[in-house]
């Protein structure tokens, strides 16, 4: 009988000590923590405009901002665009690009400021390279399908333009209430 009581007492003390250790606070500093992630495969490219492969996009979506982004509730909020307006007919979207955003080299050196012209250049690049995710906007933006299909070689006919360094404008073929959700990507 005494042996079983001793075992119970020992088990109780051991359980209590585990509980105390589990509930105790640690003294680690949040600044000392590093997030690490192991990818199943190497990315095929870091060209975020032309590739939609999972191994690429899981990296590039953390490096490149779209005009808008989703907040934790799924609402569209400003990202590279600090504000935007939509014409009354729903065909023209005008975005004010956030000033002070920078491009950086692979070595982390500041390269240039992000401007509206970069978004125009990015869309032309995606169209010229027949980017995998171009289908998301190809039939939405005025003239883009004709440019991609070779019916015109003049990119000026495509409904995207930099009004000035920090104003970007898209003209659509028809109103799309969900257009802004297409601007969360990099082009």
Annotate each PLM feature.
Residues 1-9:
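Bacterial N-terminal signal peptides that target proteins for export
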Residues 19-22:
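C-terminal motif of bacterial Sec signal peptides marking the signal peptidase cleavage site
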Residues 24-26:
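Bacterial signal peptide processing site
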Residues 38-88:
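N-terminal lobe/hinge region of extracytoplasmic solute-binding protein
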Residues 40-43, 51, 72-73, 89-91, ...:
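Solvent-exposed coil/turn segments that connect beta secondary-structure elements
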Residues 49-52, 101-110, 156-159:
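Second-shell loop/turn segments in exported
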Residues 82-133:
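Aromatic- and charge-enriched surface segment that lines or borders ligand/interaction sites
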Residues 118, 127-187:
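Surface-exposed binding/hinge segments that line
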């Amino acid at each position: 009988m005494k042996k079983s009581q001793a075992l119970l007492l020992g088990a109780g003390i051991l359980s209590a000590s585990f509980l105390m250790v589990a509930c105790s606070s640690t003294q680690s500093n949040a600044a000392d923590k590093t997030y690490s992630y192991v990818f199943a495969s190497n990315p095929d490219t870091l060209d975020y405009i032309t590739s939609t492969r999972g191994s690429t996009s899981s990296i590039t979506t953390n490096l490149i901002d779209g005009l808008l982004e989703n907040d934790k509730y799924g609402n569209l909020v400003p990202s590279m665009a600090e504000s935007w307006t939509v014409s009354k007919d729903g065909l023209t979207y005008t975005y004010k690009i956030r000033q002070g955003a920078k491009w950086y080299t692979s070595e982390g050196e500041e390269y240039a400021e992000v401007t509206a012209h970069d978004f125009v250049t990015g869309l032309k690049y995606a169209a010229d390279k027949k980017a995998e995710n171009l289908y998301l906007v190809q039939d939405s933006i005025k003239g883009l399908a004709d440019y991609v299909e070779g019916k015109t070689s003049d990119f000026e006919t495509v409904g995207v333009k930099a009004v000035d360094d920090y104003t970007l404008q898209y003209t659509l073929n028809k109103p799309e209430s969900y257009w802004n959700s297409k601007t969360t990507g990099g082009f």
